[in-house]
Amino acid sequence: LTPRPVRPAYLGVLGRIAPEKGVDRAIRIAARCGIPIKIAAKVDRADQDYYDELIRPLIENNPLVEYVGEIGDREKSDFLSGAIGLLVPIDWPEPFGLVMIEAMACGTPVIAYNRGSVPEIVDDGLTGFVVEDEISAVAAVDRLADLDRGQIRKVFERRFTARRMALDYLAAYRGLMEEAEPRVRLVSSAE
């Protein structure tokens, strides 16, 4: 994923519509800010009732909300580059939020609830904001313009590329090899 030369114009939600993902909270955050929100997400069969009962009523006849459905990798760069920020108002301990890293790859800041891996991924005040609730998320939206999208991309390149991961693995293996004692010890030379 790479940044696209577009003018950001909406808040974004990417991924899956499920209670723990907080799409209803994202819609309320955008509404409180008076900013349009685009939701690019799938609805799994198990979450259909949540969508029908809670999300659909928030979307229908709401000019600020656009539900675009599930998108593929080809559309993600455009979607994320067009977002002022990505909202991730989760209420479960997300082990690793890939959508946050995808946003950062496009230079898009992230506003995410302080759950699970969020504080390890989002550098508060640099790549986005780690927040506690809807009120602090609304306040963070007002500060998104202060963040440098080019710097967000640089942080992604420094921390989350496949090359970075491979180098980290090599360093870990080297460290383990240096710490390990040899399994075979020579008592004396054969000469």
Where are these regions (language model features)?
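Acidic donor-binding loop of glycosyltransferase active sites
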Residues: 81-95, 108
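Short glycine/serine-rich donor-binding loops of glycosyltransferases
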Residues: 97-100, 118
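Short hydrophobic beta-strand element within catalytic cores of glycosyltransferases
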Residues: 105, 109-112, 122
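A short, well-ordered alpha-helix in the C-terminal region of glycosyltransferases
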Residues: 146-168, 175
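Conserved donor-binding/catalytic core segment of Leloir-type glycosyltransferases
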Residues: 1-40
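Short alpha-helical donor nucleotide-sugar binding micro-motif in glycosyltransferases
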Residues: 70, 78-83, 169
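Nucleotide-activated donor-binding/catalytic signature segment of Leloir-type glycosyltransferases, i.e.
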Residues: 39-41, 52-74
